[in-house]
A protein has these predicted regions:
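Specific transmembrane alpha-helical segments of multi-pass solute transporters/efflux pumps
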Residues: 17, 21-22, 50, 57-99, ...
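Loop-to-transmembrane alpha-helix entry segments
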Residues: 104, 120-140, 151-158, 211-212
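Hydrophobic transmembrane alpha-helices of multi-pass small-molecule transport proteins
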Residues: 49, 114, 123-145, 190, ...
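Membrane-interface helix termini and inter-helical loops of multi-pass transporters
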Residues: 23-34, 59-63, 89-96, 142-154, ...
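Specific alpha-helical transmembrane segments that line the substrate/conduction pathway
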Residues: 36-47, 88-120, 164
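Glycine-/small-residue-enriched transmembrane alpha-helix faces in small-molecule transporters
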Residues: 1-39, 43, 149-177, 192-196, ...
Length: 235
């Protein structure tokens, strides 16, 4: 299997898993808010991935990490596993699912745009068309065809979802500069999300245990939708 085919397969796996986000976000926030749901999901992701990394013997590499490595990992963890999901879960709880879904998936367009500046990639005709069509699709949905005005039910929440999508795009571009073992750095990303969501949960919400109905969405989200999907994504 060539590298390009393997990369395409990994992307397809991620897309299939991330398609479950609206489902787990809805059922996982029956009584929990976005801070609480993110905390429990991050806890599951961190526990599962760290156990896997430890059993494989790869976790020992963190001993050789420099301060710069830890700082960069913390930044990426905040961008891609905390801010992105914090705003995304808020969106699915308080805004129209279709609007959230469309704005959420602006990150592939933003990845192309950011790569031009941060990775010095060339702007080809294909990339130009992709960016233009992508933004046209987003504008069409948000304006409902009336391009003179934006018609969304909760503009602030949708704007936050858009900010989260930008953070995930930035995370995706910057993560290409990380040369560490994927399962190790991903487990550390979710450690950052776990700590950050714990602080924000206590600051803006409150500690709460998930209900019995919320356990399975949290497990599914923590193990697959968030957890292992990131290993495929950053490869």
């Amino acid at each position: 299997v060539t590298g390009r085919v393997r990369g395409t397969l990994f992307v397809l796996i991620c897309v299939a898993l991330w398609a479950l986000i609206p489902v787990v976000a809805r059922f996982g926030q029956a009584s929990l808010d976005n801070h609480q749901f993110l905390f429990w999901s991050s806890l599951v992701s961190f526990a599962v991935l760290t156990l896997n990394a430890a059993l494989s013997g790869k976790m020992r590499e963190i001993v050789g990490y420099t301060r710069a490595d830890w700082g960069f990992i913390a930044l990426l963890g905040l961008l891609g596993t905390y801010v992105y999901y914090l705003f995304l879960y808020l969106g699915y709880a308080r805004a129209s699912g279709l609007e959230v879904l469309v704005v959420q998936y602006t990150w592939p367009i933003l990845i192309v745009a950011l790569s031009l500046f941060l990775l010095r990639e060339k702007l080809t005709l294909r990339k130009t068309v992709a960016i233009a069509l992508g933004f046209l699709g987003v504008v069409t949905v948000l304006t409902k065809g009336d391009y003179a005005r934006i018609d969304v039910g909760n503009p602030l929440v949708i704007a936050l979802v858009g900010a989260g999508a930008f953070c995930f795009a930035l995370f995706s571009v910057l993560s290409k500069k990380v040369d560490k073992t994927p399962i190790v750095v991903v487990s550390l990303y979710f450690l950052v999300a776990l700590l950050a969501s714990f602080v924000s949960m206590l600051s803006f919400s409150g500690f709460a245990l998930p209900s019995r109905q919320e356990v399975w969405p949290i497990l599914l989200n923590g193990v697959l939708v968030n957890g292992y999907s990131y290993i495929f994504w950053i490869r």
